């Protein structure tokens, strides 16, 4: 761009009146956008590094499992340092339940509902996201409750948290055996 073009395009009313300032929220948003736009290989590299820094060993799991788990997280967090807390449940069998959520989601009335959901998952012909979503919705309808009434206790039982990747996709990645064990453990402990 020549000096003449710059002078022609310059417009004083477009200049901000206040001083420049650091905007932490915008930085977090920008970091999230950056992570979302990364190529799969670079995303995987940075994610595995974040888990390693948090002393979570992803190397003891098959590569296809680690990549499938990380794919469920893409676009769901802002900083890679958040990833171990967000998705660490994929890489451990020891699930710590959020105490406050456990009081709410593992209420006595939810135990028989979670048992019915466990039975529906066990009977599912395929253990993929679409089949599991249909099984959950059918179970909710049969129980006369909204799907969310089953989603929250199920997510807590399987991940220990109230938020995270898509429930149906994370169930598929974890696999039938792990999901059944985790739901059974939650039913036994609460």
Locations of the language-model features?
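C-terminal accessory/binding modules appended to enzymatic or scaffolding proteins
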Residues: 102-158
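Catalytic adenosine-cofactor/nucleotide-binding cores of aminoacyl-tRNA synthetases and other
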Residues: 1-100, 104, 159-190
């Amino acid at each position: 761009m020549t000096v003449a073009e710059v002078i022609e395009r310059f417009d004083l009313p477009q200049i901000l009146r206040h001083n420049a300032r650091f905007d932490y929220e915008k930085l977090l948003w920008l970091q999230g956008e950056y992570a979302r736009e990364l190529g799969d290989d670079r995303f995987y590299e940075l994610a595995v590094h974040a888990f390693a820094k948090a002393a979570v060993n992803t190397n003891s799991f098959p590569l296809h499992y680690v990549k499938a788990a990380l794919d469920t997280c893409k676009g769901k967090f802002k900083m890679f340092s958040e990833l171990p807390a967000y998705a660490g449940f994929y890489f451990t069998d020891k699930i710590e339940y959020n105490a406050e959520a456990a009081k709410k989601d593992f209420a006595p009335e939810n135990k028989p509902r979670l048992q019915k959901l466990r039975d529906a998952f066990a009977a599912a012909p395929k253990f993929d996201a679409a089949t599991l979503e249909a099984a959950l919705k059918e179970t909710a309808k049969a129980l006369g409750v909204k799907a969310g009434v089953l989603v929250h206790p199920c997510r807590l039982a399987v991940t220990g948290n109230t938020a995270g990747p898509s429930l149906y996709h994370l169930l598929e990645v974890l696999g039938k055996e792990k999901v059944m064990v985790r739901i059974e453990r939650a039913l036994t402990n609460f």
